[in-house]
Amino acid sequence: MLSFASSLSSDNEAFAIFVNDQFNFKDRKNLLSKEASKKINSYLSTLKDKKSEEEISSFDISGKQKCFIIKVKKKYETYYPEEKGGVFYSYLKNFKVIKKIDIYIDSLDFEKEEIVNFSSEFIFGFSLKSYTFDSARKE
C-alpha cells in the first residue's frame, strides 16, 4: 500500500507529503511538477490562513490524483512518528478506492539521519495499525 517515492508521476493515484507546523515543505529533489507544487502551496496557504489544527488532510490534485498532507512537529517525543503512522493508516481507511500511496519522505525539513529514523518509525506505526488478528480468531 505504501511506497517511498524517488519520483512522482501524474499516473500515481495518491501521494503524501510532510509539512512542518507552519505548513511549509521541501521539494528537495524536485519530484513535484510545477503545477502540483502550485496547487499544494495554494492548499497549504489556505490551511495556514484558517490556522488549521488538522494533523492530516487531503485534497485532489486532479480528478485522478489525491495529495495527502501530514503535519509534523519539529520537536516531538520518541513515539510520535510511530503514532503519526498509525493515525495516517486510520485516515486512509476513509479512502477505500486508493490502493497505493507514494510517500515523499524527503519533503520533511529534517537532516538525513532524522529523516531515516522518522520514516522507519512512521512505517512501523502504519504497519502496526494495519495488523489484524483475523488468523488468530479462526479455529
Predicted regions span which residues?
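Short amphipathic alpha-helical segment within the helicase RecA-like ATPase core
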Residues: 1-139
